[in-house]
């Protein structure tokens, strides 16, 4: 949620409230800032716990195989999302230099990327956007974002609410061409079967029917359908100067084929939002083709493919979410997925099929192991300190100009600063460079109560 949901989507982030209630019950313990493969191994975890559930999601961009994809201004959406969400493992700066930008893909990630690129910085300030990101967006020269999809309006993967949201962004027009509306029997069948898809088509139609004379905003988001990217074109200096697409046409069943009609679109940057891909976990098998940990209904299996359901099960190791089934579905759709995995875990526990531990079992034993290795781990109590600190940074802004309210928080970006705050250390204005480029705003010192924390992992 912290590094995957756009900062201007507080509605989606409300899932945090439910997670808070669970973590505050006291029967779930958090050990943060611990990397599997660096600080602990899968074998360490299997030795200390009866079962392991892998829920690491998908953090990489799915590859796109077209000429020019490796040009310097060709960016993966996952990297851009990680930057604007303040992921500490990504650079603090982003080269926002292009006036015209292409976004490849017709899912909600493409909408997020397009919206953040087009939105004025002052309209992001009331969110938890990191200070360095807000400052970069303030200097963004962009005027036009072009979103490209291979198929038609009946096949796009936008959800209705996120698509309608584009039309509410201040000083941004959404432009759709009437020429991009075509439906075959497969399309009509898809619309009959899905009320959500009918809502999406209705919203796209409303954008297409808007009076062009009403398009007076300083920034525009253009949605182009039936356009398949075929090449990212470089100038003589090796920088992006254009995107070439091929016009496609419906085949009758909802699929499309190329028509041979090529269009060149002048853009200076390309963002690829064509899907996510999970990263392998050291010590576990990985299906490179599917981008998941091989499993059968959540039980992790040996081998390198999920398709081999006869492969031996690795006792006590399970998977859930995108690392289990691939990057499909939203936060809510993971519930049934998790229930399936947990039902198998409970069944295996009752049948005595879990892994036999070889070390001292439990949380305290793992804490002792981490401390013996010098790992600066953090806890739930430490997260509460960081949460309060970020809210204090937001309060320091006071009222935003133009009646935009107040900042809910300012997200701390640096891993070092997050670790220090979470472990009870004092972080003050002298450490502003660790928190992010705060501009002319002074960074408030940590409240005294942060120094009162004496929980596990406290750094003396």
Task: For each feature predicted by the language model, list its residue ranges.
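Phosphate-coordination loops involved in phosphoryl transfer and adenosine-cofactor binding
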Residues: 33, 97-100, 142, 226
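Dinucleotide-binding/catalytic capping subdomain of oxidoreductase cores
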Residues: 2-4, 11, 15, 111, ...
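Glycine-/small-residue-rich beta->alpha transition segments that form the dinucleotide
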Residues: 51, 55-62, 107-108, 228, ...
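Feature captures the FAD/FMN-dependent oxidoreductase FAD-binding
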Residues: 16-74, 221-224, 230-244
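FAD-site-proximal beta/loop scaffold in flavoenzymes
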Residues: 72-91, 232-235, 239, 251-325
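Glycine-rich dinucleotide-binding loop and its adjacent helix/turn
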Residues: 61-139, 292-306
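C-terminal, flexible cofactor-proximal segment of oxidoreductases
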Residues: 303-460
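Core beta-strand elements of the Rossmann-like FAD/NAD(P) dinucleotide-binding domain
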Residues: 44-51, 96-97, 257-268
């Amino acid at each position: 949620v912290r590094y995957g949901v756009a900062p201007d989507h507080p509605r989606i982030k409300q899932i945090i409230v439910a997670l808070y209630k669970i973590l505050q019950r006291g029967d779930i313990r958090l050990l943060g800032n611990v990397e599997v493969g660096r600080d602990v191994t899968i074998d360490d975890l299997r030795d200390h716990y009866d079962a392991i559930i892998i829920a690491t999601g998908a953090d990489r961009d799915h590859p796109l195989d077209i000429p020019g994809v490796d040009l310097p201004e060709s960016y993966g959406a996952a990297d851009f999302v990680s930057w604007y969400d303040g992921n500490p493992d990504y650079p603090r700066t982003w080269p926002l230099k292009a006036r015209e930008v292409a976004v490849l893909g017709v899912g909600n990630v493409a909408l997020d990327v397009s919206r953040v690129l087009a939105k004025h910085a002052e309209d992001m300030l009331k969110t938890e956007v990191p200070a360095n990101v807000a400052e970069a967006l303030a200097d963004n020269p962009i005027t036009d974002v072009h979103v490209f999809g291979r198929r038609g309006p009946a096949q796009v993967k936008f959800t209705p609410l996120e698509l309608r949201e584009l039309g509410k962004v201040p000083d941004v027009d959404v432009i759709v061409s009437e020429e991009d509306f075509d439906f075959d029997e497969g399309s009509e069948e898809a619309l009959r079967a899905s009320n959500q898809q009918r809502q999406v088509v209705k919203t796209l139609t409303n954008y297409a029917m808007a009076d062009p004379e009403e398009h007076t905003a300083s920034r525009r988001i253009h949605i182009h359908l039936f356009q398949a990217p075929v090449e990212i074109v470089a100038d003589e200096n090796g920088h992006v100067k254009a995107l070439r697409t091929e016009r496609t046409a419906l085949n009758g069943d909802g699929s499309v084929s190329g028509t041979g009609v090529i269009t060149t679109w002048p853009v200076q940057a390309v963002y690829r939002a064509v899907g996510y891909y999970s990263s392998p976990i050291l010590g576990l098998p990985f299906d490179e083709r599917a981008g998941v940990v091989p499993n059968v209904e959540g039980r992790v299996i040996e081998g390198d493919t999920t398709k081999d359901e006869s492969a031996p099960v690795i006792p006590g190791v399970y998977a859930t979410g995108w690392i289990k089934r691939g990057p499909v579905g939203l936060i809510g759709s993971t519930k049934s997925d998790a229930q399936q995995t947990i039902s198998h875990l409970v069944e295996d526990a009752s049948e005595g099929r879990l892994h036999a531990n070889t070390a001292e079992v439990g949380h305290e034993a793992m804490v002792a192991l981490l401390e013996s290795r010098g790992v600066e781990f953090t806890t739930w109590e430490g997260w509460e300190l960081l949460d309060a600190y970020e809210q204090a940074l937001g309060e320091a802004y006071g009222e935003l100009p133009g009646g935009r309210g107040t900042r809910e928080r300012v997200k701390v970006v640096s891993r070092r600063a997050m670790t220090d705050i979470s472990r009870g250390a004092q972080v003050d204005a002298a450490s502003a460079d660790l928190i992010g480029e705060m501009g002319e705003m002074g960074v408030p010192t940590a409240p005294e109560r942060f120094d009162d924390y004496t929980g596990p992992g406290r750094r003396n």
